[in-house]
Swiss-Prot record:
This is D-aminoacyl-tRNA deacylase. A Gly-cisPro motif from one monomer fits into the active site of the other monomer to allow specific chiral rejection of L-amino acids. GO terms for molecular function: D-tyrosyl-tRNA(Tyr) deacylase activity; Gly-tRNA(Ala) deacylase activity; Ser(Gly)-tRNA(Ala) hydrolase activity; tRNA binding. Homodimer. Belongs to the DTD family. GO terms for biological process: D-amino acid catabolic process. It comes from Shewanella piezotolerans (strain WP3 / JCM 13877). A motif (Gly-cisPro motif, important for rejection of L-amino acids) lies at residues 137-138. The gene is dtd. One of its GO terms (cellular component) is cytoplasm. An aminoacyl-tRNA editing enzyme that deacylates mischarged D-aminoacyl-tRNAs. Also deacylates mischarged glycyl-tRNA(Ala), protecting cells against glycine mischarging by AlaRS. Acts via tRNA-based rather than protein-based catalysis; rejects L-amino acids rather than detecting D-amino acids in the active site. By recycling D-aminoacyl-tRNA to D-amino acids and free tRNA molecules, this enzyme counteracts the toxicity associated with the formation of D-aminoacyl-tRNA entities in vivo and helps enforce protein L-homochirality. The lineage of its organism: Bacteria, Pseudomonadati, Pseudomonadota, Gammaproteobacteria, Alteromonadales.
Amino acid sequence: MIALIQRVSEANVVVDGETIGEIDKGLLVLLGVEREDDLAKMEKLATKVMSYRVFSDDNGKMNLNLEQAGGSLLVVSQFTLAADTGRGLRPSFSGAGTPEQARELYQAFVDFCLSKGVNTQTGEFAADMKVSLVNDGPVTFNLQV
């Protein structure tokens, strides 16, 4: 399971001209599901995302996690993160989870974050989305479990 996280000062997702999710300070999480992923990996990754210390403390050091910084999550499904780009000029998605598996784990990720009290907004699974963000830093990390 892969989470490409970006520290943002604001981000939103638009589907069919309508804003369906938006946050101010927080993390934009692009979430990719691989064939071998399960609920245990989802929980481990969600915990890591929420606990990862990427927000600056009073000394300017990246030392605060999402809760400590008073941030929110915007979680967007992104199956292309599971692409194999090692050969040729076209990505292969043979390692990506099935749509059913990905939908289940994406929703479980969102539900887990909500259950921990994190303000969590979402995109729409498998929709054509327009994602806008203001990357703060920029600060971007690729987390994988």
